[in-house]
Amino acid sequence: YEAKFEEKLLEAKKMGATTVIYGDIDIELHRQWDIDRATNAGLDYELPLWQGDREKVVHEFIDAGFKAVIKKVNLENMSEDFLGKTLDKPLIEEIKKTGSDACGENGEYHTFVVDGPLFSTPIELDVLGKTISNGYGILDVK
């Protein structure tokens, strides 16, 4: 995974990218992984959310107009029923009721951002189904 990630960073660098922006908040192991990948690819890096309040971060993301769809859930924490749902404040409350972190920072869930103020057009996801694999529920999309 690391090699493939760095390969994609090198491709982005060839296209003119100079900096990698990461969304990690406060897990040092993740921060170091981010730094290592960027450094190995010869790119600068920024972690603008680093040391932010997790719940505040996710609320600011939603308030800013970003739309993210839950793409993967850890079935130890959350049910596959969360797959395909768009992150909003009521859903954050549902997520917290499962005992999961509001941001999913501990790997409870992962999202795919499909729209927001930086997008010229939203990304349309064609949902093909759901897969259960190795303790995770995964939304299959095209």
List each model region and its residues.
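Nucleotide-activated chemistry modules centered on ATP-dependent adenylation/adenylyltransferase
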Residues: Y1-K142
